[in-house]
Structure formats: C-alpha cells, structure tokens
Amino acid sequence: MDKEQARKEIKRLTALVAYHNKLYYEEAQPEISDYEFDQLLEKLIALENQFPDLRLPNSPTQRVGGEPSKKFATVYHQYPMLSLSNTYSAEEVMQFVKRAHKQLPGATIEFFCELKFDGVAISLLYKEGKLDKVVTRGDGFKGDDITENAKQIPNIPQIIEHKDLPPAFEVRGEAFMSLADFEKLNRDRLAHGLEPLANPRNATAGTLKTLKSTGPKRWLDCYMYSLLSTDMDLPTHEVCIQWLEKWCFHVSPTYKKCRTLEEVMAYIEYWESAKNSLPVAIDGVVIKVNDTLQQNKLGLTAKSPRWAIAYKYKPENLATILESVDYQVGRTGVITPVAHLKPILLAGTIVKRATLHNAGEIQRLDLHLGDTVFIEKGGEIIPKITGTDVSKRSLDSEPVKFVTHCPACGTELVKRYEKALYYCPNTKGCPYQLQGLLKHFVHRKAMDIRSIGKQTIEMLINRGLVHTPADLYSLKYQDIRSLEGFKDLATRNVLSGIESSKQRPFERVLFALGIRHVGEVIADKITQYYTDIDTLSNATVEDLIAIPFIGTEIAHSVTNYFENPENLALIDVLKQAGLQLSRPQLATVFATQSLPLSGKTFVISGTFQNFEREELKELIKKKGGGILTNISAKLNYLIIGENPGPGKVAQAQALGISTINETEILQMLEL
C-alpha cells in the first residue's frame, strides 16, 4: 500500500471506528460485534504505526470510549479511567508477559487474573464512608454523573461502616445485567409491545442512562475490581481486592493470582470452556501485574496501562442447517430476512434464528435451503450466519431468493438508495408498517403511552379503529372497552395515557412521527433550530444541512416527509388534538450557543493544506457552525482555499459576504 492509499484508508477507518465507538459507548446500540470492531481498530493501529505522520488528530486509537452525554452533569476523574489493550491471540499474551519481565529485569512478577465481564465500567467515589458520586468512564478523563440512577442498584453500598476506612477512596467496577434478568426484562418488553434489547450490555448501558432515577435499575448488578486511595497503603492488586471484600463490596470470586505464564494460560483456557456456566456474560480475561510499584514502573500509554492486558474470547462459531427464511416488515417498510435454523446450543442458549440483514447478505452468502451454515453469536440475542459449507450442499437444493412483494400486504417492493434494502411502498395500507409505526409512536421515548402495548395495537388495527397514529386521539371509551380483555380500569388507563401524551414536548412528537433517519437525538437537534412544525415543514434541504450534525440523507428524508400531503393531513389532526407542535422559545438556548461558530454559516471553496473539505466541514459543525452549499443572503462567510470557484467568489463579493482564508478559519476554530 502506497502512502496515498494509506492516507485514504486511515481516513476511512478513523471515521468508521469513531462511528461504531459512538454507537457502542454513547448510544448503546452497536451494529457490529466486539470482534468485528476490534478487527477494524487493529487495522487502523497497524496503518498508523506504519505511517505515523498520517495519524489524524481525532484518531480513536488515542482516546478511550465515547464522549460524556449532554444529558448528565460531567465529572472529571481524579485518576484517568483508561481502557485496556486487548487481544484475541495467546501469542500476544505471552509477549505481554515477556515484556513485563524484560522491563523489570530480575524481578519476581505475579499476575492477577480476573474475568472480563460484559457490562459498563463505573467509578464509585466515597467520602467519610458515604457514597458521594457514581461516574461512567466517558472518554477516560471525564464521565457522566449517574449517582441517582446507580443508587438504585441493590449491591452498591451507600454507607460503609468500618473502622479502617480512609477519608476518601474510589472503587471501580462493572455494572451488568445477569442473563436470567435480561431474559425476564425482554419478556416484559415484549409483553408491552416493545422491541427486545440486543444484549445485556446494551440493556445495562441504557438503564444507567435513563434520565428518570426510578425504574428497572434493580435489574442491575455490579462486580467491583479496583480500589484507589491516596490515604491507604495498597502494595498489590490482591490487597485491593481483599479490602473490597472486607468492606462487603460485591467481588466476583473467580479471580486467581498466577506466578507463571503457564498458570495464566491455564486460567484463560479453563474459563473459555466454563464461561457458559456463569450467570453473567463475559467476553474474556483481564491479566494484571499484581505489584503496585511494578505497575508504576511499567507505566501507561495515552489510552491504556502497560501493566495489564485483556484476552478476549472469539465468538463461538458452530454449524447447523438452514431450514427456511421468512421476511419481516419494519415500521418504515424495510424488509428484513430472518433465517430459521435447526436448533443448536450456542453460547449457553438454544439458537433457532439468525439475522440475514438484507438481500445483499443473502447473495453474498449464496444461501440455499437445507445448507449447512456457520453461525456466530458475538453477544447478540439473534446470531448471524457467517458462512456456508458448500461441500455439503445437495445438488437439488433451492437457492434462497429475496421476496419481490410485501409478505404483509402483497405490494411490489422497491429498492431505495445504494444499499441492498427493499421497502414496501404501501406506507398507509400495509398492516405491519402501521403496527410498527404505532408501536414506535406510543414508545416511552416518543409519546410515552405505556398503557398501549403490542396486543392492543393489533386489536385496534384489526377492528378498523386506528389507521394512523392520529386516530388514537379520537378513540372513545366504548371503542376501547369493546376490545377483548378490556374492563373499566384498563380502558380508563388507555384513555388517560393518550390524554397525558398531549403534553409531550415537540421534540418527542417529532421523533414519534417516525420520519426515516430522525431518531431521538436528531429530533432534539432539529427542534432547537426549528421551534414549530410549520417552520420545519417549509425548511429546504439546504436549510436543514446547515444544522450541525444533520447530513444530506437526513435532510432529504425530512423534506420528503413534509412533501407528502397525507403526512401534512396527519399533522393537522394532531394539531387539532392538542399535541405540542412547537417548542418554547426558552428551549432554544441549546448547547452550541457557547461554541465559537454558533449561529454562523459557511460555504467552502477550493483546496486546503491542512484539511480535506469534508474534514473542515465537520470541524465547523462541531464548533457550532452551519454549512451551506450555495452563496445566498443567509451566508456569513465564504472560506476560500487554493483554486476557489471564481463564480462563488464574485457572487459573495456582490452580496457583501466576508471571504476568509485557511489561516483565518483556523483562528475562528480556535485550533
């Protein structure tokens, strides 16, 4: 690979890893397995090591985790809360042990081995024996204050009474949800018409970040694994664990002190075969140098300690038979194929289904009915098919062909965008889409009508009582009372929930409409700039992409939604029902107002020494500025590099718009 190819690949991988980092740490909605993420990160690290001058300033290899959330107060860590370097290779564990001996010549080194629980790292701060704060890892230097939420976890002690307590100390651990409680939670969600959560880690992260301090925190548990204090003599990690146990913190009893590499490898091998017997998900083993002075000598990198490493188990991959494929219809009309498999025991659970994602995946795998397929469960509830054993394929086997018509309403499918995604275009008449839209509309993050679950929605649709979300607001007592199983109290609960939803703020209503690509965060961002539905409905694509973090795809999706007369009619009914379709002016005091480029708009023309144009656009957006594509009276600045478009320069001069160069925009960006 030459240097130009490396530059492009580093840029691509940096953006890709940052994207998946955000999904994992900030949104708790990962799209790929840990193993796939680690492989991407390893590729980026290898390229950056080969071409160190091409490493980007925002490289995820130089930072930990994700940004703290704006929803919670930020707390700076007294000691950096670094992540661990990890490996899937036994050889690299051996190299780690050899490096430790090389850097500590002649020393006797003990290694402390612990299981790596698949949860969320948290820090507990105690003062005078009382729990003062609980903070997430965040970016390693600062995290979110989740104290009130964490206090709901039963085995986090809020007061410790012991004569040997120091004035202040910090305990670190892993919050998690047991496999049994995770299954109970998902059964509960399904009973209320909610989508099941993907895995226990997602459930834990989402629960800890729920703004309400009440709720299902008692589903959570916590294992503690670290003690920090300037007021204590802590010569070894083993002593730290002993103090935690003495103070009645919840410590996993699965740790082991090892004196040789052979003992370390035996510990790894034992738990690889025994991990499915545990009540909680693990994804590997953590190996630490036990002695604190030796840890200090080995030191830290910017991202991780040199005295510890995480060995991660590869996802299990087993073979079974593909029996059939069916097709599910989502609320936006997306058709998702699901493979039905001959049941097999994988990672401690019986697996009968696997996701196939889209038509492209079926084609890539060259699937035939009756194939012997390899499945992998990398922490997700629905595993995926990773390959096919073609040598075992029957000569008369039938290839899997993606459906051409909607399985719910029979409408011919259409392919949209460049992705291998097929949609049912019958947005108003497809019963599965309506079910999905209504489930989304009543969700707690949208209109929060918790008294309406999946079964109620199905009955309302089957009775012809509801054809759009707006029809919920015209339901009468007798309409609901006539549904199977509904008595007076349940009926009144539904009506009360519908009435209460009229007070949900504008950003929640916008999210509830189910506009493609407009999630909870994007809805909030849009309504900070467009504070009522009428103004938003008249916004152009160019107007919308001027909003930080709003790209072309989202902007087109929003404008397309408001160009549809049926959607405008729906909004009129929601207005008449009394929903909040505007945001109070006070709410426009949003986070970007204190950023250096807040409220300013820019057009970029030409090439630049320090940036690609897309990089410059993202920097401007992150500093609060907006990006326009054309010169207009709305523009504040035209940024000109080498060989700018002469037409744009002339147009800017004619309108009296300021032109600035690369040095000036760097000053404005405060870089």
Curated annotation (Swiss-Prot):
InterPro entries: BRCT_dom, BRCT_dom_sf, DisA/LigA_HHH, DNA_ligase, DNA_ligase_AS, DNA_ligase_CS, DNAligase_adenylation, DNAligase_N. The keyword Transmembrane does not apply. Zn(2+) binds at C406, C409, C424, C430. It catalyses: NAD(+) + (deoxyribonucleotide)n-3'-hydroxyl + 5'-phospho-(deoxyribonucleotide)m = (deoxyribonucleotide)n+m + AMP + beta-nicotinamide D-nucleotide. Its EC number is 6.5.1.2. PROSITE patterns: BRCT, DNA_LIGASE_N1, DNA_LIGASE_N2. Keywords: DNA damage, DNA repair, DNA replication, Ligase, Magnesium, Manganese, Metal-binding, NAD, Zinc. Pfam families: BRCT, DNA_ligase_aden, DNA_ligase_OB, DNA_ligase_ZBD, HHH_2, Nlig-Ia. Residues 592-671 form the BRCT domain. SUPFAM superfamilies: BRCT domain, DNA ligase/mRNA capping enzyme, catalytic domain, Nucleic acid-binding proteins, RuvA domain 2-like. GO terms for cellular component: cytosol. GO terms for biological process: DNA repair; DNA replication. Its cofactor is Mg(2+); Mn(2+). NAD(+) binds at D34, Y35, E36, F37, D38, S83, L84, E114, R137, E174, K288, K312. The active site is at K116 (n6-amp-lysine intermediate). One of its GO terms (molecular function) is DNA ligase (NAD+) activity. Belongs to the NAD-dependent DNA ligase family. LigA subfamily. DNA ligase that catalyzes the formation of phosphodiester linkages between 5'-phosphoryl and 3'-hydroxyl groups in double-stranded DNA using NAD as a coenzyme and as the energy source for the reaction. It is essential for DNA replication and repair of damaged DNA. This is DNA ligase. The gene is ligA.
